[in-house]
From Swiss-Prot:
<keyword id="KW-0067">ATP-binding</keyword>
<dbReference type="Pfam" id="PF01583">
    <property type="entry name" value="APS_kinase"/>
</dbReference>
<dbReference type="Pfam" id="PF01747">
    <property type="entry name" value="ATP-sulfurylase"/>
</dbReference>
<dbReference type="InterPro" id="IPR027535">
    <property type="entry name" value="Sulf_adenylyltr_euk"/>
</dbReference>
<dbReference type="InterPro" id="IPR050512">
    <property type="entry name" value="Sulf_AdTrans/APS_kinase"/>
</dbReference>
<feature type="binding site">
    <location>
        <begin position="292"/>
        <end position="295"/>
    </location>
    <ligand>
        <name>ATP</name>
    </ligand>
</feature>
<dbReference type="GO" id="GO:0004020">
    <property type="term" value="F:adenylylsulfate kinase activity"/>
</dbReference>
<comment type="similarity">
    <text>In the C-terminal section; belongs to the APS kinase family.</text>
</comment>
<feature type="binding site">
    <location>
        <begin position="435"/>
        <end position="438"/>
    </location>
    <ligand>
        <name>3'-phosphoadenylyl sulfate</name>
    </ligand>
</feature>
<keyword id="KW-0486">Methionine biosynthesis</keyword>
<comment type="function">
    <text>Catalyzes the first intracellular reaction of sulfate assimilation, forming adenosine-5'-phosphosulfate (APS) from inorganic sulfate and ATP. Plays an important role in sulfate activation as a component of the biosynthesis pathway of sulfur-containing amino acids.</text>
</comment>
<dbReference type="GO" id="GO:0004781">
    <property type="term" value="F:sulfate adenylyltransferase (ATP) activity"/>
</dbReference>
<feature type="binding site">
    <location>
        <position position="198"/>
    </location>
    <ligand>
        <name>sulfate</name>
    </ligand>
</feature>
<feature type="binding site">
    <location>
        <begin position="198"/>
        <end position="201"/>
    </location>
    <ligand>
        <name>ATP</name>
    </ligand>
</feature>
<feature type="site" description="Transition state stabilizer">
    <location>
        <position position="207"/>
    </location>
</feature>
<feature type="binding site">
    <location>
        <position position="334"/>
    </location>
    <ligand>
        <name>ATP</name>
    </ligand>
</feature>
<keyword id="KW-0808">Transferase</keyword>
Length: 574
């Protein structure tokens, strides 16, 4: 039998409000609407389906203060993470938000009405206090703190919700269970005791050994419930991770484990988050919850130390275990013993015993370089999934971004580089020349700084998508401003390698060899906002390569670029 929900009753607002769905939908069409962010949507889904029971809406000021200060709602119920709907003054004014007002909450992805919020109060939070009390610090290297300070808006709106529509998902539908559905699934399987395992990372043999040990220690089954909402920036995408979990599942003893996805927006809140995770798993029917080393920890702070102690989360959950109503299963790091081919918790290993380990950094290096990942660390079927999503450098897309004055030679270099890369084969080559982009992507833009920056932003977006798809991209705009170039690098590097090449041909040479007469026209005032004449050019501070067509020929410059690409493992051969 599944565990009792937190607070005694599962607050499944979808089930509660289903008889009134048509009525609520009709009302929602007439109300002002607030479009929710991705994080809001994650929170909303788990409020509406009962995953955040006993919550029935976003926190009012009384509830918020209780949670921040004491891990408790205003009625005394244990709850450790503030669930807030943040808005700005413009939204308050535009939507007429005030106590008693009703507002539709809308999905930004498909413009569907999801719920109606009845506003109870609007309040301005003390964000510094929230950061220190909830996350233990106001250090913005913590992603939860950074979000709070940089993204969360000025005011919070509290109030109860009425459910209209479920959020639409189009991936892994067979693994998406509401708390009610998962409880029914456990009952169908006849599971009496369920140990839940939280993860935001791929699982390897150590995780399998840990969860099997936990289940056997409690004579229970295992629920692998990975987060597929928002996790730590830089984490492996959930599509890859879920394929890993599915590949791993057959390695469990027959009938021991089940896999279900959790659409949670993590805060990386360490001890507080562990308590919150336990409440969520209790609502999903689990009777036990694994809390391991540095649970939901965000990594290092500004001093280079971990934000939380390795077992702080276990201490906090243990303090509230009796009231919490879900049993914590403590586990330390699992270490491999090659002489006996087994994993043991680090505190059970005799001193002097030979051990082996592969760090996360080393694993990423082996994936990048194609080096062997031994079976004692991870199963072949798991490694296969990870290698599919981590192609070798020679199989990846990349962007070569050239910047320089008009007539500096960028276009000639770009065309020659395109021919050279096409000769080598292995990936498609796309070219984004300044004039072509202006004609095809940005015909309405002028040459003000704002328009120039927008043009570079568009080039960067196209380059990032092509790079993600495995193409070699050669971009050659003037790109005169450092901030826009940095933004382009930041965007493209999310998809693959980015190389900034400064074509530093002197302005005098560019003007002297100008056969089109554009410099002369600019000097005569016929062309305005012309880079190098009446508009500035900011030389790159940290280019990956500097070339000069006055001193070099196109062939030698292309060879330099090819050598740069080859040294980064992006070309099989010269």
């Amino acid at each position: 039998m599944a565990n009792t929900p937190h607070g005694g009753v599962l607050k499944d607002l979808f089930a509660r409000d289903l008889p009134r769905q048509s009525e609520l939908e009709a009302e929602a069409q007439k109300l002002p609407a607030l479009t929710l962010s991705e994080r809001h949507l994650c929170d909303l889904e788990l409020i509406l389906n009962g995953g955040f029971s006993p919550l029935e809406g976003f926190l009012t000021e009384k509830d918020y203060n209780g949670v921040v200060e004491n891990n408790r709602l205003a009625d005394g119920a244990l709850f450790s993470m503030p669930i807030n709907l943040d808005v700005n003054q413009a939204e308050i004014d535009q939507l007429g938000l005030k106590a008693g007002a009703r507002v539709t909450l809308r999905d930004f992805r498909d413009d569907r009405n999801l719920a109606i919020l009845t506003v109870e109060d609007i309040y301005r939070p003390d964000k510094v206090n929230e950061a220190k009390k909830v996350f233990g610090s106001d250090d913005d290297t913590h992603p939860g703190v950074k979000y709070l300070f940089d993204t969360a808006k000025e005011f919070y709106v509290g109030g109860k919700l009425e459910a209209i529509n479920r959020l639409e998902h189009y991936d892994f539908l067979d693994l998406r269970f509401t708390p009610s559905e998962l409880r029914a699934h456990f009952n169908k399987l006849g599971w009496q005791k369920v140990v839940a395992f939280q993860t935001r990372n791929p699982m390897h043999r150590a995780h399998r050994e840990l969860t099997v040990r936990a289940a056997r220690s409690q004579q229970a089954n295992v629920l692998i419930q990975p987060v597929v909402g928002l996790t730590k920036p830089g984490d492996i995408d959930h599509f890859t991770r879920v394929r890993v979990y599915k590949a791993l599942l057959p390695r469990y003893p027959n009938g021991m484990a089940a896999l279900a996805l959790l659409p949670l927006a993590m805060r990386m809140g360490g001890p507080r988050e562990a308590l919150w995770h336990a409440i969520i798993r209790k609502n999903h029917g689990a009777t036990h919850f694994i809390v391991g080393r540095d649970h939901a920890g965000p990594g290092k702070n500004k001093q280079g130390k971990d934000h939380y102690g390795p077992y702080d989360a276990q201490v906090l959950v243990q303090e509230h275990q009796e009231e919490l109503g879900i049993k914590m299963v403590e586990f330390q790091a699992m270490i491999y013993l090659p002489d006996s081919d087994e994993y043991l918790p680090i505190n059970e290993i005799p001193e002097g015993t030979r051990t082996l380990n592969i760090s996360g950094t080393e694993l990423r290096h082996r994936l990048r370089t194609g080096k062997d990942i031994p079976e004692w660390f991870s199963y072949p079927e798991v490694v296969k999934v990870l290698r599919e999503e981590n192609p070798l450098p020679a199989e990846k897309g990349f962007t070569v971004f050239m910047t320089g004055y008009q007539n500096s030679g960028k276009d000639q270099i770009a065309r020659a580089l395109q021919a050279t890369l096409n000769q080598g084969g292995g990936r498609p080559v796309s070219m984004l020349l300044g004039e072509n982009v202006r004609h095809e992507l940005s015909p309405e833009l002028g040459f003000t700084r704002k328009d120039r920056d927008l043009n570079i932003q568009r080039i960067a977006f196209v380059a990032s998508e092509l790079t993600k798809a495995g193409a070699a991209v050669i971009a050659a705009p003037i790109a005169p401003f450092e901030d826009a170039r940095k933004a382009a690098r930041d965007l493209v590097e999310k998809s693959g390698p980015f190389f900034l090449v400064h074509v530093a041909t002197p302005l005098e040479y560019c003007e002297k060899t100008d056969r089109k007469g554009v410099y002369a026209a600019a000097r005569n005032g016929e062309i305005k906002n012309f880079t190098g004449v009446d508009d500035p050019y900011e030389a790159p501070a940290k280019p990956d390569l500097v070339v000069d067509l006055e001193k070099q020929n196109v062939r030698s410059i292309v060879h330099q670029i090819v050598l740069l690409l080859e040294s980064n493992g992006l070309l099989d051969r010269l």
